[in-house]
Protein backbone atom coordinates (compact mmCIF):
# COMPACT_ATOMS: atom_id res chain seq x y z
CA UNK A 1 0.00 0.00 0.00
CA UNK A 2 2.72 2.47 1.01
CA UNK A 3 4.70 1.58 -2.14
CA UNK A 4 1.65 2.39 -4.26
CA UNK A 5 1.25 5.81 -2.63
CA UNK A 6 4.99 6.51 -3.04
CA UNK A 7 4.79 5.66 -6.76
CA UNK A 8 1.66 7.80 -7.10
CA UNK A 9 3.49 10.81 -5.61
CA UNK A 10 6.25 10.36 -8.19
CA UNK A 11 3.68 10.65 -11.01
CA UNK A 12 2.90 14.38 -11.61
CA UNK A 13 -0.83 14.13 -12.41
CA UNK A 14 -1.50 11.59 -9.65
CA UNK A 15 0.47 13.72 -7.20
CA UNK A 16 -1.76 16.66 -8.11
CA UNK A 17 -4.88 14.54 -7.48
CA UNK A 18 -3.58 13.28 -4.13
CA UNK A 19 -2.66 16.80 -2.96
CA UNK A 20 -6.08 18.08 -4.09
CA UNK A 21 -7.77 15.30 -2.10
CA UNK A 22 -5.66 16.11 0.98
CA UNK A 23 -6.60 19.79 0.64
CA UNK A 24 -10.33 18.96 0.57
CA UNK A 25 -9.88 16.70 3.61
CA UNK A 26 -8.23 19.58 5.53
CA UNK A 27 -11.18 21.86 4.65
CA UNK A 28 -13.63 19.18 5.78
CA UNK A 29 -11.91 18.70 9.13
CA UNK A 30 -11.69 22.48 9.59
CA UNK A 31 -15.46 22.80 9.10
CA UNK A 32 -15.98 20.05 11.68
CA UNK A 33 -14.50 22.37 14.35
CA UNK A 34 -16.33 25.65 13.54
CA UNK A 35 -19.33 26.07 15.91
CA UNK A 36 -22.78 26.93 14.60
CA UNK A 37 -23.86 30.55 15.35
CA UNK A 38 -25.91 30.76 18.54
CA UNK A 39 -24.16 27.91 20.37
CA UNK A 40 -22.24 28.38 23.63
CA UNK A 41 -18.93 26.71 22.84
CA UNK A 42 -17.81 26.57 26.50
CA UNK A 43 -20.99 24.80 27.63
CA UNK A 44 -20.77 22.35 24.72
CA UNK A 45 -17.19 21.46 25.66
CA UNK A 46 -18.19 20.94 29.29
CA UNK A 47 -20.93 18.50 28.27
CA UNK A 48 -18.76 16.74 25.66
CA UNK A 49 -16.00 16.17 28.23
CA UNK A 50 -18.53 14.70 30.64
CA UNK A 51 -20.14 12.52 27.94
CA UNK A 52 -16.74 11.13 26.88
CA UNK A 53 -16.25 9.71 30.37
CA UNK A 54 -19.51 7.80 30.37
CA UNK A 55 -21.74 5.83 28.04
CA UNK A 56 -23.30 8.20 25.52
CA UNK A 57 -23.97 5.86 22.65
CA UNK A 58 -27.42 7.19 21.75
CA UNK A 59 -26.11 9.58 19.11
CA UNK A 60 -23.03 7.45 18.47
CA UNK A 61 -23.87 6.41 14.89
CA UNK A 62 -24.42 9.94 13.57
CA UNK A 63 -21.56 11.32 15.65
CA UNK A 64 -19.23 8.68 14.18
CA UNK A 65 -20.17 9.58 10.59
CA UNK A 66 -19.63 13.28 11.34
CA UNK A 67 -16.17 12.74 12.85
CA UNK A 68 -17.34 13.93 16.27
CA UNK A 69 -18.86 17.13 14.84
CA UNK A 70 -22.44 16.25 15.87
CA UNK A 71 -21.97 16.56 19.62
CA UNK A 72 -19.76 19.63 19.05
CA UNK A 73 -22.70 21.23 17.13
CA UNK A 74 -20.50 22.58 14.32
CA UNK A 75 -21.40 23.68 10.80
CA UNK A 76 -20.65 20.13 9.58
CA UNK A 77 -22.51 18.59 12.54
CA UNK A 78 -24.71 16.40 10.33
CA UNK A 79 -21.71 15.23 8.31
CA UNK A 80 -22.48 12.81 5.49
CA UNK A 81 -25.29 11.00 7.32
CA UNK A 82 -28.11 12.76 5.35
CA UNK A 83 -26.38 11.78 2.09
CA UNK A 84 -25.95 8.15 3.20
CA UNK A 85 -29.61 8.00 4.26
CA UNK A 86 -30.77 9.58 0.99
CA UNK A 87 -28.67 7.16 -1.07
CA UNK A 88 -30.05 4.13 0.79
CA UNK A 89 -33.66 5.38 0.49
CA UNK A 90 -33.32 5.93 -3.27
CA UNK A 91 -31.67 2.54 -3.69
CA UNK A 92 -34.62 0.92 -1.94
CA UNK A 93 -37.16 2.99 -3.90
CA UNK A 94 -35.52 1.93 -7.18
CA UNK A 95 -36.87 -1.58 -6.56
CA UNK A 96 -40.49 -0.50 -5.93
CA UNK A 97 -40.88 2.52 -8.27
CA UNK A 98 -40.79 1.56 -11.99
CA UNK A 99 -39.77 5.09 -13.06
CA UNK A 100 -36.61 4.99 -10.93
CA UNK A 101 -35.83 1.46 -12.13
CA UNK A 102 -36.12 2.67 -15.74
CA UNK A 103 -33.77 5.58 -14.98
CA UNK A 104 -31.24 3.15 -13.52
CA UNK A 105 -31.22 1.20 -16.78
CA UNK A 106 -30.73 4.33 -18.94
CA UNK A 107 -27.02 4.41 -18.20
CA UNK A 108 -25.11 7.60 -17.52
CA UNK A 109 -28.00 10.01 -18.17
CA UNK A 110 -30.32 8.06 -15.88
CA UNK A 111 -27.68 7.86 -13.17
CA UNK A 112 -27.20 11.64 -13.38
CA UNK A 113 -30.93 12.09 -12.76
CA UNK A 114 -30.85 9.72 -9.76
CA UNK A 115 -27.84 11.66 -8.41
CA UNK A 116 -29.89 14.87 -8.73
CA UNK A 117 -32.76 13.30 -6.77
CA UNK A 118 -30.24 12.16 -4.14
CA UNK A 119 -29.04 15.74 -3.71
CA UNK A 120 -32.57 17.09 -3.25
CA UNK A 121 -33.42 14.36 -0.74
CA UNK A 122 -30.13 14.99 1.10
CA UNK A 123 -31.01 18.67 1.60
CA UNK A 124 -34.55 17.77 2.75
CA UNK A 125 -33.20 15.23 5.25
CA UNK A 126 -30.58 17.75 6.42
CA UNK A 127 -33.37 20.24 7.21
CA UNK A 128 -35.27 17.57 9.18
CA UNK A 129 -32.20 16.28 11.02
CA UNK A 130 -30.91 19.80 11.67
CA UNK A 131 -34.27 20.83 13.13
CA UNK A 132 -34.28 17.74 15.33
CA UNK A 133 -30.72 18.36 16.52
CA UNK A 134 -31.40 22.02 17.35
CA UNK A 135 -34.61 21.12 19.20
CA UNK A 136 -32.73 18.44 21.15
CA UNK A 137 -29.91 20.87 22.00
CA UNK A 138 -32.37 23.59 23.11
CA UNK A 139 -34.22 21.23 25.44
CA UNK A 140 -31.00 19.93 26.99
CA UNK A 141 -31.74 16.33 25.93
CA UNK A 142 -28.60 16.15 23.76
CA UNK A 143 -26.48 15.74 26.89
CA UNK A 144 -28.73 14.21 29.54
CA UNK A 145 -27.15 14.57 32.97
CA UNK A 146 -24.93 17.52 32.07
CA UNK A 147 -25.53 20.47 34.47
CA UNK A 148 -25.29 23.08 31.68
CA UNK A 149 -27.11 21.05 28.98
CA UNK A 150 -30.03 23.50 28.86
CA UNK A 151 -27.61 26.42 28.36
CA UNK A 152 -26.00 25.12 25.15
CA UNK A 153 -28.25 27.45 23.14
CA UNK A 154 -28.53 30.59 25.35
CA UNK A 155 -30.72 32.54 22.92
CA UNK A 156 -33.69 30.32 22.06
CA UNK A 157 -35.49 32.77 19.78
CA UNK A 158 -37.04 31.60 16.52
CA UNK A 159 -34.51 33.60 14.48
CA UNK A 160 -31.56 31.88 16.19
CA UNK A 161 -33.16 28.47 15.63
CA UNK A 162 -33.68 29.17 11.91
CA UNK A 163 -30.09 30.41 11.53
CA UNK A 164 -28.76 27.24 13.19
CA UNK A 165 -30.86 24.93 10.98
CA UNK A 166 -29.95 26.83 7.80
CA UNK A 167 -26.25 26.77 8.74
CA UNK A 168 -26.28 23.00 9.31
CA UNK A 169 -28.19 22.41 6.07
CA UNK A 170 -25.71 24.57 4.16
CA UNK A 171 -22.90 22.63 5.85
CA UNK A 172 -24.37 19.34 4.62
CA UNK A 173 -24.64 20.75 1.08
CA UNK A 174 -21.00 21.89 1.34
CA UNK A 175 -19.91 18.41 2.48
CA UNK A 176 -21.76 16.89 -0.47
CA UNK A 177 -20.04 19.36 -2.83
CA UNK A 178 -16.61 18.59 -1.33
CA UNK A 179 -17.24 14.89 -1.84
CA UNK A 180 -18.16 15.42 -5.49
CA UNK A 181 -15.02 17.53 -5.99
CA UNK A 182 -12.88 14.64 -4.74
CA UNK A 183 -14.69 12.22 -7.07
CA UNK A 184 -14.21 14.50 -10.10
CA UNK A 185 -10.72 15.89 -9.49
CA UNK A 186 -9.16 13.76 -6.75
CA UNK A 187 -8.56 10.11 -5.90
CA UNK A 188 -11.32 7.66 -4.98
CA UNK A 189 -15.02 8.11 -4.30
CA UNK A 190 -15.43 11.47 -2.58
CA UNK A 191 -18.21 10.61 -0.13
CA UNK A 192 -16.48 7.35 0.81
CA UNK A 193 -13.21 9.22 1.47
CA UNK A 194 -15.00 11.75 3.71
CA UNK A 195 -16.72 8.87 5.53
CA UNK A 196 -13.31 7.24 6.01
CA UNK A 197 -11.83 10.47 7.42
CA UNK A 198 -14.82 11.07 9.73
CA UNK A 199 -14.49 7.64 11.32
CA UNK A 200 -10.68 7.67 11.48
CA UNK A 201 -10.73 11.11 13.15
CA UNK A 202 -12.54 9.68 16.18
CA UNK A 203 -10.13 6.78 16.72
CA UNK A 204 -7.31 8.54 18.65
CA UNK A 205 -9.62 10.13 21.23
CA UNK A 206 -11.67 6.92 21.54
CA UNK A 207 -8.58 4.79 22.15
CA UNK A 208 -7.20 7.26 24.68
CA UNK A 209 -10.56 7.34 26.48
CA UNK A 210 -10.34 3.54 26.83
CA UNK A 211 -6.88 3.93 28.36
CA UNK A 212 -7.90 6.66 30.82
CA UNK A 213 -11.05 4.81 31.92
CA UNK A 214 -9.29 1.43 32.20
CA UNK A 215 -8.60 -0.24 35.52
CA UNK A 216 -5.87 -2.80 34.74
CA UNK A 217 -2.30 -1.42 34.82
CA UNK A 218 -3.57 2.16 34.53
CA UNK A 219 -5.64 1.22 31.50
CA UNK A 220 -2.75 0.03 29.35
CA UNK A 221 -4.00 -3.59 29.24
CA UNK A 222 -7.40 -2.47 27.94
CA UNK A 223 -5.70 -0.10 25.50
CA UNK A 224 -3.44 -2.72 23.92
CA UNK A 225 -6.18 -5.37 23.99
CA UNK A 226 -8.44 -3.14 21.90
CA UNK A 227 -5.59 -2.42 19.47
CA UNK A 228 -4.84 -6.16 19.17
CA UNK A 229 -8.51 -6.98 18.58
CA UNK A 230 -8.60 -4.18 15.99
CA UNK A 231 -5.64 -5.60 14.04
CA UNK A 232 -7.16 -9.10 14.06
CA UNK A 233 -10.49 -7.70 12.87
CA UNK A 234 -8.85 -5.69 10.09
CA UNK A 235 -7.04 -8.81 8.86
CA UNK A 236 -10.29 -10.81 8.94
CA UNK A 237 -12.25 -8.06 7.19
CA UNK A 238 -9.63 -7.70 4.43
CA UNK A 239 -9.69 -11.48 3.86
CA UNK A 240 -13.49 -11.77 3.70
CA UNK A 241 -14.01 -8.55 1.69
CA UNK A 242 -11.68 -9.92 -0.99
CA UNK A 243 -13.33 -13.38 -0.98
CA UNK A 244 -15.71 -14.13 -3.84
CA UNK A 245 -17.36 -17.02 -5.64
CA UNK A 246 -16.64 -16.80 -9.37
CA UNK A 247 -19.40 -18.20 -11.58
CA UNK A 248 -17.86 -19.11 -15.00
CA UNK A 249 -19.63 -17.66 -18.05
CA UNK A 250 -18.97 -18.54 -21.69
CA UNK A 251 -20.17 -16.66 -24.75
CA UNK A 252 -21.10 -18.50 -27.92
CA UNK A 253 -19.12 -17.64 -31.06
CA UNK A 254 -21.16 -15.70 -33.64
CA UNK A 255 -20.34 -14.80 -37.24
CA UNK A 256 -21.49 -11.36 -38.38
CA UNK A 257 -20.39 -10.85 -41.98
CA UNK A 258 -16.78 -11.95 -42.11
CA UNK A 259 -16.07 -11.17 -38.49
CA UNK A 260 -16.28 -13.57 -35.57
CA UNK A 261 -17.68 -12.31 -32.28
CA UNK A 262 -17.87 -13.99 -28.88
CA UNK A 263 -16.25 -17.24 -28.00
CA UNK A 264 -14.74 -15.67 -24.88
CA UNK A 265 -15.05 -16.80 -21.27
CA UNK A 266 -15.42 -14.66 -18.18
CA UNK A 267 -17.02 -14.94 -14.74
CA UNK A 268 -19.61 -13.36 -12.45
CA UNK A 269 -17.95 -12.37 -9.14
CA UNK A 270 -20.31 -12.97 -6.20
CA UNK A 271 -18.75 -11.56 -3.03
CA UNK A 272 -19.14 -13.42 0.25
CA UNK A 273 -20.15 -10.11 1.81
CA UNK A 274 -22.39 -9.00 -1.05
CA UNK A 275 -24.38 -6.63 1.19
CA UNK A 276 -21.39 -4.64 2.45
CA UNK A 277 -21.85 -2.55 5.58
CA UNK A 278 -25.49 -1.60 4.89
CA UNK A 279 -27.05 -4.34 7.12
CA UNK A 280 -24.99 -3.13 10.11
CA UNK A 281 -26.14 0.46 9.55
CA UNK A 282 -29.78 -0.66 9.18
CA UNK A 283 -29.64 -2.78 12.35
CA UNK A 284 -27.92 0.01 14.31
CA UNK A 285 -30.50 2.55 13.16
CA UNK A 286 -33.41 0.29 14.11
CA UNK A 287 -32.04 -0.34 17.62
CA UNK A 288 -31.43 3.41 17.84
CA UNK A 289 -35.21 4.10 17.76
CA UNK A 290 -36.24 2.56 21.15
CA UNK A 291 -33.53 4.55 22.93
CA UNK A 292 -34.77 7.75 21.28
CA UNK A 293 -38.36 7.03 22.33
CA UNK A 294 -37.33 6.50 25.95
CA UNK A 295 -35.09 9.57 26.06
CA UNK A 296 -37.64 11.99 24.59
CA UNK A 297 -40.71 10.57 26.36
CA UNK A 298 -39.11 10.73 29.83
CA UNK A 299 -41.58 8.01 30.78
CA UNK A 300 -41.23 6.03 34.02
CA UNK A 301 -43.60 3.29 32.84
CA UNK A 302 -42.62 -0.37 33.00
CA UNK A 303 -42.07 -0.67 29.25
CA UNK A 304 -39.75 2.36 29.22
CA UNK A 305 -37.69 0.97 32.10
CA UNK A 306 -37.46 -2.42 30.35
CA UNK A 307 -36.23 -0.78 27.12
CA UNK A 308 -33.77 1.34 29.09
CA UNK A 309 -32.37 -1.73 30.86
CA UNK A 310 -32.34 -4.20 27.95
CA UNK A 311 -32.21 -2.41 24.58
CA UNK A 312 -29.93 0.57 25.17
CA UNK A 313 -26.91 -1.21 26.68
CA UNK A 314 -24.66 -2.88 24.13
CA UNK A 315 -23.47 -5.47 26.66
CA UNK A 316 -26.95 -6.81 27.45
CA UNK A 317 -27.71 -10.27 25.97
CA UNK A 318 -31.09 -9.06 24.61
CA UNK A 319 -29.42 -6.16 22.80
CA UNK A 320 -26.65 -8.31 21.31
CA UNK A 321 -29.12 -11.03 20.23
CA UNK A 322 -31.46 -8.52 18.58
CA UNK A 323 -28.51 -6.77 16.93
CA UNK A 324 -27.11 -10.03 15.53
CA UNK A 325 -30.49 -11.28 14.21
CA UNK A 326 -31.27 -7.90 12.60
CA UNK A 327 -27.91 -7.89 10.81
CA UNK A 328 -28.53 -11.40 9.42
CA UNK A 329 -32.05 -10.42 8.30
CA UNK A 330 -30.96 -7.17 6.63
CA UNK A 331 -28.05 -8.94 4.90
CA UNK A 332 -30.48 -11.25 3.09
CA UNK A 333 -32.96 -8.41 2.53
CA UNK A 334 -30.38 -6.06 0.99
CA UNK A 335 -28.86 -8.77 -1.23
CA UNK A 336 -32.36 -9.62 -2.48
CA UNK A 337 -33.03 -6.04 -3.59
CA UNK A 338 -29.54 -5.16 -4.85
CA UNK A 339 -28.81 -8.26 -6.96
CA UNK A 340 -31.47 -9.48 -9.39
CA UNK A 341 -30.60 -12.99 -10.70
CA UNK A 342 -33.38 -12.87 -13.33
CA UNK A 343 -32.05 -9.61 -14.77
CA UNK A 344 -28.50 -11.01 -14.89
CA UNK A 345 -29.74 -14.21 -16.56
CA UNK A 346 -31.73 -12.22 -19.16
CA UNK A 347 -28.72 -10.04 -20.00
CA UNK A 348 -26.51 -13.11 -20.39
CA UNK A 349 -29.07 -14.75 -22.68
CA UNK A 350 -29.39 -11.57 -24.74
CA UNK A 351 -25.65 -11.50 -25.49
CA UNK A 352 -25.25 -15.26 -25.97
CA UNK A 353 -23.73 -16.02 -22.58
CA UNK A 354 -24.32 -19.16 -20.54
CA UNK A 355 -23.01 -20.94 -17.46
CA UNK A 356 -21.46 -24.31 -18.43
CA UNK A 357 -23.87 -27.12 -17.53
CA UNK A 358 -26.79 -24.73 -16.88
CA UNK A 359 -29.46 -23.87 -19.43
CA UNK A 360 -29.92 -20.20 -20.30
CA UNK A 361 -32.90 -18.26 -18.96
CA UNK A 362 -34.83 -19.32 -15.88
CA UNK A 363 -32.51 -22.24 -14.87
CA UNK A 364 -29.60 -19.76 -14.84
CA UNK A 365 -31.53 -17.35 -12.60
CA UNK A 366 -32.42 -20.20 -10.21
CA UNK A 367 -28.79 -21.35 -10.09
CA UNK A 368 -27.56 -17.82 -9.34
CA UNK A 369 -30.17 -17.47 -6.57
CA UNK A 370 -29.10 -20.81 -5.10
CA UNK A 371 -25.40 -19.86 -5.05
CA UNK A 372 -26.14 -16.37 -3.72
CA UNK A 373 -28.23 -17.71 -0.83
CA UNK A 374 -25.50 -20.18 0.12
CA UNK A 375 -22.73 -17.57 0.27
CA UNK A 376 -24.96 -14.95 1.95
CA UNK A 377 -25.28 -17.16 5.04
CA UNK A 378 -21.56 -17.06 5.95
CA UNK A 379 -21.45 -13.41 4.85
CA UNK A 380 -24.29 -12.41 7.20
CA UNK A 381 -22.84 -14.40 10.12
CA UNK A 382 -19.47 -12.74 9.50
CA UNK A 383 -21.10 -9.29 9.61
CA UNK A 384 -22.86 -10.11 12.86
CA UNK A 385 -19.68 -11.38 14.51
CA UNK A 386 -17.60 -8.41 13.32
CA UNK A 387 -20.23 -6.04 14.71
CA UNK A 388 -20.30 -7.76 18.12
CA UNK A 389 -16.63 -8.68 18.69
CA UNK A 390 -15.46 -5.17 19.77
CA UNK A 391 -18.42 -4.83 22.14
CA UNK A 392 -17.72 -8.22 23.73
CA UNK A 393 -13.99 -7.48 23.95
CA UNK A 394 -14.59 -4.19 25.74
CA UNK A 395 -17.29 -5.79 27.92
CA UNK A 396 -14.68 -8.20 29.22
CA UNK A 397 -12.93 -5.20 30.76
CA UNK A 398 -16.09 -3.44 31.92
CA UNK A 399 -16.01 -0.62 29.39
CA UNK A 400 -18.09 -1.79 26.48
CA UNK A 401 -19.92 0.48 24.14
CA UNK A 402 -18.38 3.70 25.40
CA UNK A 403 -16.04 4.40 22.50
CA UNK A 404 -16.99 2.12 19.58
CA UNK A 405 -20.76 2.69 19.61
CA UNK A 406 -21.80 0.21 16.93
CA UNK A 407 -19.22 -2.53 16.95
CA UNK A 408 -17.33 -3.21 13.75
CA UNK A 409 -19.18 -0.68 11.58
CA UNK A 410 -16.19 1.65 11.56
CA UNK A 411 -13.68 -1.09 10.71
CA UNK A 412 -15.88 -2.46 7.90
CA UNK A 413 -16.17 0.99 6.32
CA UNK A 414 -12.50 1.92 6.78
CA UNK A 415 -11.24 -1.35 5.27
CA UNK A 416 -13.75 -1.25 2.40
CA UNK A 417 -12.94 2.35 1.44
CA UNK A 418 -9.21 1.77 1.89
CA UNK A 419 -9.19 -1.29 -0.39
CA UNK A 420 -11.24 0.49 -3.05
CA UNK A 421 -9.00 3.59 -3.01
CA UNK A 422 -5.79 1.52 -3.23
CA UNK A 423 -7.26 -0.44 -6.16
CA UNK A 424 -8.06 2.81 -7.97
CA UNK A 425 -4.53 4.16 -7.42
CA UNK A 426 -3.00 0.90 -8.69
CA UNK A 427 -5.32 0.93 -11.71
CA UNK A 428 -4.27 4.47 -12.64
CA UNK A 429 -0.60 3.60 -12.16
CA UNK A 430 -0.94 0.59 -14.48
CA UNK A 431 -2.74 2.72 -17.05
CA UNK A 432 0.14 5.20 -17.09
CA UNK A 433 2.71 2.39 -17.37
CA UNK A 434 1.01 1.12 -20.52
CA UNK A 435 0.76 4.54 -22.16
CA UNK A 436 4.09 3.97 -23.89
CA UNK A 437 2.70 0.96 -25.75
CA UNK A 438 -0.40 2.85 -26.85
CA UNK A 439 1.39 5.71 -28.62
What is the predicted function of each stretch?
Residues 1-104, 109-439:
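N-terminal cationic and glycine-rich segments that engage phosphates or anionic surfaces
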Amino acid sequence: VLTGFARAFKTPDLRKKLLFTLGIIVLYRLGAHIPVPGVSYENVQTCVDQASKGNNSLFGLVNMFSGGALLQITIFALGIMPYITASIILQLLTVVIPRLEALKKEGQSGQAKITQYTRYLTVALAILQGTGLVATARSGALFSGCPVADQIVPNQSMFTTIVMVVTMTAGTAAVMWLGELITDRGIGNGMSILMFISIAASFPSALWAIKTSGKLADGWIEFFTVILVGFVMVALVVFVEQAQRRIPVQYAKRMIGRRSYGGTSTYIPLKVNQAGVIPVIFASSLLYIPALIVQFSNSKAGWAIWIQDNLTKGTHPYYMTAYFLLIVFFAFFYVAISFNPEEVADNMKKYGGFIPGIRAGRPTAEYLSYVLNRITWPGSLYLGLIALVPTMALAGFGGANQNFPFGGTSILIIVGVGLETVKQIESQLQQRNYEGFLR
